[in-house]
């Protein structure tokens, strides 16, 4: 489970643009269900992102 403050990267489950492929994001809010999908909000990312499309980094 992801928590506020966790560092994450987008994995290959969904399409990821070249700009975001290696970028490390910080979880700012969530998780919450959006349209039936569990999502979190990320710093410097517009909108929320599906939890299963993210991998936690150390």
Residue ranges, per PLM feature:
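Basic/aromatic-rich interaction segments and small domains that mediate binding to polyanionic partners
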Residues: 7-57
């Amino acid at each position: 489970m992801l928590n506020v403050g966790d560092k994450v990267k987008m994995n290959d489950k969904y399409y990821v643009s070249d700009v975001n492929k290696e970028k490390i994001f910080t979880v700012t809010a969530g998780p919450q269900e959006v349209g039936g999908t569990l999502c979190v909000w990320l710093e410097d990312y517009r909108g929320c992102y599906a939890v299963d499309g993210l991998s936690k980094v150390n």
